[in-house]
Amino acid sequence: MTQTTNGSYGLGDFVLQSGIVLSNAFIGYQTYGALNSRRDNVIVFPTWYTGTNGQVAPYVAKGKALDPEKYFIVIPDMFTNGSSTSPSNAADPHRDLDFPLVTPFDNVIAQRRLLEEYFNVTGIELMAGFSMSGQLAYHWAALHSDLVKRACSICGTAKTSPHNWAMLHAYKSTMEASPNWLNSACSEWDPKILTIVSSIGATMAMSQDWYRQGQHLSGDIIDVASAIENLKSLFASWVPANLYAQTLTWMAADVSDNSTFNGDLAAALAAIKIPFLMMPCNTDLYFRVADNEAEIPYMSNATLTVIESSSGHMAGLPGFSSDDDAFVNEQLLKLLRIPSIN
């Protein structure tokens, strides 16, 4: 039986990139497998927008890239997802809408502390991520290559694109439009706001082709309206203030926005020397193939492999499509076979 653990690690007073201190911060995690004697047989796969650590499970199995009999697999929870420090559980004065911006940079610092301070990890064979955690892969590769040997971004980019930012602004402004947003609506969903947020998600997460093919129809889901109703359950499970804070994190994603690169995106991409795999989906409406194509000329050791699928952004979501999962797994296996440079 595969060894698994769930837990959280206390980070103490965690200084954010902004200089604001999160008191008694903590990071949640799930692990599979066991560390070897060198403590370097590690794969890291953080959570994503609306993701929690248990959702990576479809990628984890004997013989797969994320093989718990071969690797120690760590699934860190991103700040704001409810399992790590978030608006809903933060210490005063950072509860609810007083929660400060937490950047991808901050998340990676916290994840590295978890790995080194708690698990005493000495090396990472692969850092992979989907969507928002695919954006974290760029941060790991550009800023922490002393620890990580390979990285993969599945349906992600080094910086949130203008169109992606505009979509996120739709989520943000919709939540802010709730009549009681500054009071109870940040902790409990206004039904009308929940419907609008779910409609935005249904519009953007899957492609036009996916709907045209009738992929949304199954069981009680007989039309697009009932598909949106079904998606409500995902968003309803989130505290609105947590989703709001996670939206701000996604909007702020930029691998060059730190004191190392000072906003020079080309320099940040050029700093990625380890084997790096970009895996966009050809029908993704969030992260376009063209966005990755624009990045790759600056990177000396990167490969771009396209997921050909009608699933849109969900092509990279573990468990959404068995065909997409199989393709992603095969590409990760190939990446793991590439010799490391460090």
Question: Which positions does each model-derived feature cover?
Answer:
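A short loop-to-beta-strand scaffold at the N-terminal edge of the catalytic core in hydrolase folds
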Residues: L22-A34
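Short beta-strand element of the alpha/beta-hydrolase
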Residues: R39-T50
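Alpha/beta-hydrolase-fold enzymes
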Residues: L147-K149, S153-S233
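Acidic catalytic loop of the alpha/beta-hydrolase fold
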Residues: W250-D254, N282-F287
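Short alpha-helix in the alpha/beta-hydrolase fold that links the catalytic acid
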Residues: N258-L265, I274, L285-Y298
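Short beta-strand/loop motif that positions the catalytic acidic residue
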Residues: I272, M278-P280
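Catalytic active-site module of serine/aspartate enzymes centered on a nucleophile-bearing elbow/loop
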Residues: E293-P297, N301-N342
